[in-house]
Design a protein with these regions (language model features):
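Face-selective signature of the C-terminal outer-membrane beta-barrel domain
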Residues: 79-101, 125-267
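Transmembrane beta-barrel wall of Gram-negative outer-membrane proteins
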Residues: 1-105, 117-122, 126-140, 144
Length: 267
């Protein structure tokens, strides 16, 4: 892609004149290059320490946050019993909880193809954030008929696990990439109806007989993230189809294809 812009060669040569840690021999090689292809091997030379000093950075600025995730959680629960006769009562219990988490991925260094330095000149540390919601409620009626204890109840619960990827990018989008993506959700719900019978056995002390019925429904779903979070885009900004020629793929300065999807966790 870079060969398509004839201005780039001149811009690089002009900028090289302003870099004070390039010696005269190296500058001469850059000025003598007649194409981007001739510049590519020259600009792979390692100037890490000099460039860090020029940018006012240290190696610690490229550290990962391993085992240092943050967490915020809230919970609310209720428990209630309402007697309505000598032997029968209504009951209910349940709650709602919410948890937000944030963890870091691997640092994307500026010399990697998965980093578009036009947006992240110093690389970046992508963050995986999660929003987890849990809800549950149980309600029932229980009591006695003769020596039998009877309990009829219904329990409903659901969970949603949503991913948002922040401080990241879809490298194949170049300058058009956002820095935050909806990367999808996982959902689960369950509903259970129970009817239980139990009574003590008169012939055996501390022994009981019990039986019951249960009906359970479960549902699980995976919700895809937004298209920007998983698609790879071509040089025109459209979704790159499978089998597309390499000439349609976005590349970095050195000709490496730029990956699609949100870095650290595509949707």
């Amino acid at each position: 892609n870079v060969d398509a812009d004839p201005r780039l060669l001149g811009l690089i040569k002009g900028y090289a004149q302003e870099v004070d840690y390039f010696d005269s021999s190296y500058l001469s090689q850059i000025q003598g290059a007649t194409s981007i292809a001739a510049l590519q091997p020259l600009l792979k030379k390692d100037f890490t320490e000099q460039e860090l000093a020029y940018r006012g950075l240290g190696r610690k600025d490229f550290n990962m946050h391993v085992g240092q995730s943050s967490l915020l959680g809230t919970q609310f629960f209720i428990n209630a019993v309402i007697p309505f006769s000598q032997h029968w009562e209504l009951y209910a219990f349940g709650g709602q909880s919410y948890r937000y988490g944030e963890a870091g991925g691997f640092f994307r260094r500026p010399n990697q193809a998965r980093t578009f330095t036009g947006l992240h000149p110093n690389g970046y540390l992508p963050k995986i954030t999660t929003d987890i919601q849990d809800s549950s409620i149980s309600a029932g009626i229980r009591g006695e008929v003769g020596k039998w204890h009877i309990d009829l109840s219904n329990t409903f619960g659901r969970n949603e696990f949503a991913y948002t990827i922040k401080n990241t990018g879809n490298t194949s989008l170049l300058f058009a990439s956002p820095d935050s993506f909806d990367a999808g959700k996982l959902r689960f719900l369950q509903n259970t109806i129970n009817l239980d019978f139990s009574r003590p056995l008169e012939l055996f002390e501390k022994a009981n007989i019990s039986f019951g019925l249960e009906q359970r429904h479960e549902a699980y779903s995976t919700v895809a993230g937004e298209e920007l979070s998983y698609a790879t885009y071509d040089i025109h900004g459209g979704v790159l189809p499978l089998g597309a020629p390499s000439s349609q793929k976005t590349t970095d300065f050195f000709g490496n294809s730029l990956p699609g999807g949100a870095q650290v966790l595509p949707g």
